[in-house]
């Protein structure tokens, strides 16, 4: 679950709302003032496709240790030339 790696995730399939980075459960509870999840023994399934790619990207980003790099080479991405980025942006900007 994204909650276990520090993200609150609201499904993209129900109109994307937000992805919020939080470092501990106290921050999340003070923000929403409610219990975050109901724990059950059922298996969680993520639909394949664009949503799965987005979640995989978030997981890879959280697994990478950004602080270990001294400097980054900035790469500019033109969504018109990269179909993957174009698809992600179309999902995020869909109303």
UniProtKB/Swiss-Prot annotation:
Induction, per UniProt: Expressed in the late phase of the viral replicative cycle.
Keyword annotations: Host cytoplasm, Late protein, Virion
Cellular component GO terms, alphabetical: host cell cytoplasm; virion component
Keyword field contains Iron: no
Superkingdom classification of source: Viruses
Primary location recorded for the protein, binned into one broad class: virion
Subcellular compartments: Virion; Host cytoplasm
Function according to Swiss-Prot or TrEMBL: Late protein which is a part of a large complex required for early virion morphogenesis. This complex participates in the formation of virosomes and the incorporation of virosomal contents into nascent immature virions. J1 protein is required for DNA packaging during immature virions (IV) formation.
Quaternary structure note: Homodimer. Part of a complex composed of A30, G7, F10 kinase, A15, D2, D3, and J1. Interacts with A45.
Family listed: Belongs to the chordopoxvirinae J1 family.
Name of the protein in question: Protein J1 homolog
